[in-house]
C-alpha cells in the first residue's frame, strides 16, 4: 500500500510539473504613420476635403503612437500639414489642432471593450489617412460627414461575425470638449453583420440624424466591390448619397480602382445651395442640387511606398462648380506619393 501511495504522489507531482504555464503577452509600444505629397493639374477643385491644392502640394505627416497592455492601452494619433488641418477643425480653443485621435481603452473581457477620448468616426467607407483609402481624393459623403467624435463607446463582439457598438459623444467634430452648452449629446450605434456595417448617429445642436451603410464583397480573389450609402438630416439642411468602389488587383504591386458617387444636397450648403433664404456654400445654387463624380485611380506599391495616378470628373446639376468661371463640369489629374511606416 505504501508503494502504491508513493507512486500516486509521484504521478501527481509529474502532472503538476508538466502542466503548461499560461503566458501573458508582454505590453507593446509601437509608432506608425505615413507621409504624403501630390501634384494637382487643375487650379480649381470640387468642394471635397483634401487633395484640393493647386500644383505641387503636400498632404500631411501622420504619426501614430500606441501602447497595448494585457487589458488596456492608448492611441495618440498626430497629424501635421494641410490634410491634417482640414481633418481637425473642431479645436475650439486652438490647443489641439494636431490631434487626430487621442483615446484610452480597457478590455473588460475578450468580447467587451470600453473606449474614452477622441476617435475617428465609424461612419462611411473612406478615412482620413491616405494609406487606408484606395482613391487619393475623397467623396462628398466623406467630406461632409463627421470626421471624428469625442466621447465614450462600447464595442461588443456578440459572435465572430456579429458586433455592436454604442456611443455617447460631444457635438460632431468637437475635438476638445463640448464647446456649445446648448448642444445635446450625440448618440451613436453600429451593427456589424458578416463584414457589413449599419451606422447611426443622432443629436447635437442642429438635431442631426445620419444613417449610413458601409460594406464590401470579394467577388473573386482579385476583385473587390465596396459600397457606401448615407442619409443625413438636420435643422441646417439635408444631404444623401451613394458610392460604389470596384477594385481589381492585377499583381502584387499594381491595382486599379474606380469610385462612382452620386450626391444630393438639399439646403445643406455643400453644393452651394440656399438655406433659409440665404446663399450658403461656394456657388449660388437652388435649394437642391446634385453632383455625380467618376474617379479612376491606379495604385502601384513597392514595399512601403505607394504611387497613385488619378483622374477625376465631376458633373453637376447646375453651374455651381468653378473652373475659371461658373461651370457644371470639372476634371482634374492627380499624382500622389505616399510612404507608410
Regions inferred by a protein language model and the residue ranges of each:
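Surface-exposed coil loops of outer-membrane beta-barrel proteins
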Residues: 40-57, 84-101, 109-192, 197-202, ...
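Residues that define the transmembrane beta-barrel architecture of outer-membrane proteins
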Residues: 54-59, 95-100, 146-150, 183-187, ...
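Bacterial N-terminal signal peptides
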Residues: 1-3
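Active-site pre-Tyr helix/loop in NAD(P)-dependent dehydrogenases
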Residues: 63, 119, 258
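Detector for outer-membrane/organellar transmembrane beta-barrel domains
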Residues: 182-286, 292
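Hydrophobic transmembrane alpha-helix bundles
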Residues: 104, 110-121, 150-158, 198-210, ...
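Beta-barrel outer-membrane channel/assembly domains of diderm bacteria
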Residues: 6-114, 154-164, 218, 227, ...
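Sequence/structural signature of outer-membrane beta-barrel proteins
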Residues: 38-47, 79-87, 119-125, 135-141, ...
Amino acid at each position: 500500500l505504501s508503494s502504491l501511495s508513493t507512486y500516486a504522489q509521484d504521478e501527481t507531482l509529474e502532472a503538476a510539473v508538466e502542466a503548461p504555464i499560461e503566458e501573458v503577452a508582454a505590453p507593446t509600444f509601437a509608432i506608425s504613420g505615413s507621409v504624403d505629397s501630390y501634384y494637382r493639374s487643375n487650379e480649381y477643385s470640387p468642394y471635397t476635403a483634401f487633395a484640393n491644392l493647386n500644383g505641387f502640394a503636400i498632404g500631411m505627416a501622420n504619426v501614430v503612437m500606441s501602447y497595448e497592455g494585457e487589458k488596456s492601452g492608448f492611441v495618440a494619433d498626430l497629424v501635421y500639414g494641410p490634410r491634417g488641418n482640414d481633418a481637425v477643425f473642431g479645436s475650439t480653443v486652438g490647443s489641439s489642432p494636431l490631434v487626430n485621435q487621442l483615446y484610452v481603452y480597457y478590455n473588460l473581457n475578450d468580447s467587451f471593450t470600453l473606449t474614452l477620448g477622441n476617435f475617428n468616426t465609424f461612419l462611411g467607407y473612406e478615412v482620413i489617412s491616405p494609406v487606408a483609402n484606395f482613391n487619393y481624393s475623397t467623396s462628398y459623403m466623406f467630406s461632409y460627414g463627421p470626421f471624428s467624435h469625442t466621447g465614450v463607446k462600447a464595442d461588443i463582439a456578440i459572435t465572430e461575425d456579429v458586433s455592436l457598438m454604442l456611443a455617447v459623444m460631444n457635438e460632431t467634430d468637437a475635438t476638445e470638449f463640448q464647446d456649445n452648452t446648448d448642444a445635446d449629446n450625440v448618440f451613436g450605434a453600429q451593427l456589424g453583420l458578416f463584414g457589413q456595417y449599419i451606422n447611426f448617429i443622432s443629436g447635437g445642436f442642429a438635431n442631426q440624424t445620419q444613417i449610413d451603410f458601409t460594406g464590401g464583397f470579394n467577388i473573386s480573389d482579385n476583385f473587390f466591390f465596396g459600397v457606401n450609402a448615407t442619409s443625413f438630416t438636420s435643422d441646417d439642411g439635408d444631404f444623401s448619397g451613394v458610392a460604389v468602389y470596384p477594385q481589381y488587383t492585377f499583381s502584387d504591386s499594381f491595382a486599379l480602382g474606380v469610385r462612382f458617387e452620386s450626391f444630393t444636397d438639399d439646403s445643406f450648403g455643400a453644393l452651394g445651395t440656399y438655406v433659409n433664404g440665404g446663399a450658403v456654400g461656394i456657388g449660388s445654387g437652388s435649394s437642391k442640387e446634385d453632383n455625380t463624380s467618376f474617379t479612376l485611380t491606379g495604385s502601384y506599391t513597392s514595399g512601403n511606398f505607394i504611387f497613385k495616378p488619378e483622374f477625376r470628373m465631376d458633373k453637376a446639376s447646375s453651374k455651381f462648380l468653378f473652373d475659371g468661371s461658373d461651370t457644371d463640369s470639372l476634371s482634374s489629374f492627380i499624382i500622389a506619393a505616399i510612404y507608410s511606416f
